[in-house]
């Protein structure tokens, strides 16, 4: 049985990408490619990455930080929502400060609403 790694939807003009599973170290490149392709396809829409509990791990944090750098280069707003306080702290501490700020939320609804408001 194949596990769904991620899904996406458009919510009020915000691209919402939900990462359901941790791909592990070996799956990082695939996850990065899939998210990057979505970001480029929906550009200039703001992006919210939601990390389901099983996905809130080191490999996914690394991917999100790389996606943040891509979004900064593209001028696209990126927000992340995760219930995991350690993951939120890791994202905030390691985010690239040279480009667009990475916005990290504890709740998905808050992240989408804030991204929608910022893009309006």
Predicted segments with their positions:
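STAS-like cytosolic regulatory interaction modules
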Residues: 1-47, 51-54, 71-120
């Amino acid at each position: 049985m194949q596990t769904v790694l991620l899904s996406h939807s458009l919510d009020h003009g915000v691209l919402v990408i939900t990462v359901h599973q941790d791909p592990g170290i070996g799956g990082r490149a695939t996850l990065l490619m899939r998210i990057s392709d979505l970001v480029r396809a929906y550009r200039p829409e703001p992006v919210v990455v939601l990390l389901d509990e099983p996905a809130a791990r080191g490999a996914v944090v690394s991917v999100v930080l790389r996606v943040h750098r891509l979004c900064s280069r593209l001028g696209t707003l990126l927000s992340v929502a995760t219930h995991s306080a350690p993951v939120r702290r890791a994202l905030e501490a390691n985010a690239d400060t040279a480009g667009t700020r990475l916005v990290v939320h504890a709740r998905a609804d808050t992240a989408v609403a804030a991204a929608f408001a910022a893009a309006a």
